[in-house]
């Protein structure tokens, strides 16, 4: 069974105002695959069509996806962009394990963010901070160093996510489109 963790970084929280800057897909206990807007051909810098199409095509090869807040953000953001672009969707009924949903349901945490859960579970990898100005520099100024920091943050998130998911597996009773 093919399983992957993934994360996306976007220019805004709403897909009708933002674009996908990068995505990282990590086959379970495999190597990260990095997809960057600044390294894919596009008509304009604001055109994430090819990136979204490529990421969705790769994600659709997996039976189970793991994404923190993936049910309400990552999958929906990608599908909103794909709908606008007229490209294939990330299966909206595909099986997903969403640690934020598991944490809300089975853990009593002060906050269900990936960083809080990872700190509490003392995972080897921890989230890295990224300051807001880096997004502006990456998007507006086309600052490659800022984009590199955002991509590295996304890569680290996927490592943290895999560790958190591994520790929360005992709480997964049913894998479905609702996050577990």
Role assignments for model-derived ranges:
Residues 10, 38-43, 146-148:
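Surface-exposed cleft-lining segments at the edges of enzyme active sites
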Residues 17, 78-80, 166:
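Short amphipathic alpha-helical segments
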Residues 117-179:
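Acidic, Mg2+-coordinating catalytic module of metal-dependent nucleases/exonucleases
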Residues 33-111, 115-116:
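Conserved DEDDh/DEDDy metal-dependent 3′-5′ exonuclease domain
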Residues 7-9, 74, 98, 157:
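Acidic active-site catalytic centers that drive phospho-/nucleotidyl reactions
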Residues 5, 64-69, 96, 126-129, ...:
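A structural signal for short, well-ordered beta-strand segments and their strand-loop junctions
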Residues 1-31:
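Entry/capping segment at the start of metal-dependent catalytic domains
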């Amino acid at each position: 069974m093919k399983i992957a963790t993934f994360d996306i970084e976007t220019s805004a929280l709403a897909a009708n105002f933002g674009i996908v800057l990068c995505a990282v897909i990590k086959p379970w206990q495999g190597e990260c695959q990095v997809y960057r807007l600044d390294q894919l051909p596009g008509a304009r810098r604001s055109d994430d069509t090819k990136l979204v199409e490529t990421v969705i095509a790769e994600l659709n090869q997996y039976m189970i996806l793991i994404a923190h807040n993936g049910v309400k953000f990552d999958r929906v953001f990608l599908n909103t962009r794909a709908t606008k672009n007229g490209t294939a969707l990330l299966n909206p009924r595909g099986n997903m394990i969403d640690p934020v949903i598991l944490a809300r349901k089975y853990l009593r945490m002060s906050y269900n963010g990936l960083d809080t859960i990872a700190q509490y579970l003392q995972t080897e990898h921890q989230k890295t901070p990224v300051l807001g100005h880096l997004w502006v520099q990456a998007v507006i100024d086309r600052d490659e160093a800022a984009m590199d920091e955002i991509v590295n943050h996304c890569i680290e998130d996927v490592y943290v996510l895999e560790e958190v998911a591994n520790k929360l597996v005992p709480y997964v009773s049913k894998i479905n489109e609702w996050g577990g």
